[in-house]
Amino acid sequence: MKKLLWIIMILSLVVGCGQSYEETKRINRAQRLKALREDSAALKVAVLPTLDCLPIYLAEDHQLFDTAVDIRLKLFTAQMDIDTALANHRVEVGVSDLVRVERLKKQGDSLRYLTSTNAYWQLVSNRNARILDLKHLDDKMLAMTRYSVTDLLGDLAVDSAKLKSERVFRIQINDVNVRLKMLENNEMDALILTEPQAAVARKLKHKVLLDTRKLDMQMGVIVSQWKGMDGEARAKQLRAFTRGYNKACDSINHYGLANYASLIEKYCHVKRDALAQISKDLTFHRIALPREEDVAKAKAWLSKK
């Protein structure tokens, strides 16, 4: 009799545990589906650890986006990964440059410009490589990303120095953090960087050979999808994004870049002492479409590729 009671108790425990395990699986599955639905409905914004994204980071951290609207940041370290996310509709908004966007549009991706940004790019030479002028890039390695503003800038450098294109070895390094690390480790002769990575390079006494600002090129942009964005819910999200972005730009311009050093350090992973290398006059403009002449430059360069 006692043996029978033990068997019944053990069976009860097994059945109970089985039900508990199945119930846990069901709850976890339901939670995952709920999270996926919420993420799908949210406005997902792809960003990089670069200074042009500062208004977005500020709006997120300081709750300048309407809290009634679900806006989520998706962090990337390479522009190509943002391109893939945009092409696969895994994000609705992304930070990019005109060359990359015009190429995506040429390939059939349905994108529209939300705004230009204050991003600028610099061609920086490794001080140990003794590259004092663009002509010294002959037989040197240049880190960049193909079909981007960095690729365009590489061509401009080669053409202006009257070098043979095949004599400058373009090395595709997509991750902006890896690109800077290669300079710090003396693994690359020259690189094309934006802020704040360029500021780190300047602090380390590496030489700037080319700057898009001096070429009157404003190539940074933020884009959104065309398809699936015509509903009222998406329109409301974009309006909230625009208002939050504009507020963030106004705040940075009012208080100054130094006031947000901790935010830059948090998202861009650079030490704040490098920020002293960035001009105090740097401003962030409100939402405004890119200039037609800059779009034309991107299209003209792509037409030759």
Residue ranges with predicted function:
Residues V15-G16:
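C-terminal motif of bacterial Sec signal peptides marking the signal peptidase cleavage site
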Residues S20-K164, R170-I171, M182, D189-E195, ...:
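Short, glycine-/small- and polar/acidic-enriched structural segments
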Residues K2-I7:
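Sec-dependent signal peptide recognition
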Residues V99-R100, R167-I264:
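Pocket-lining segment of extracytoplasmic ligand-binding domains
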Residues S20-Q31, A35-L43, L51, A190, ...:
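An extracytoplasmic/periplasmic, membrane-proximal ligand-sensing/linker region
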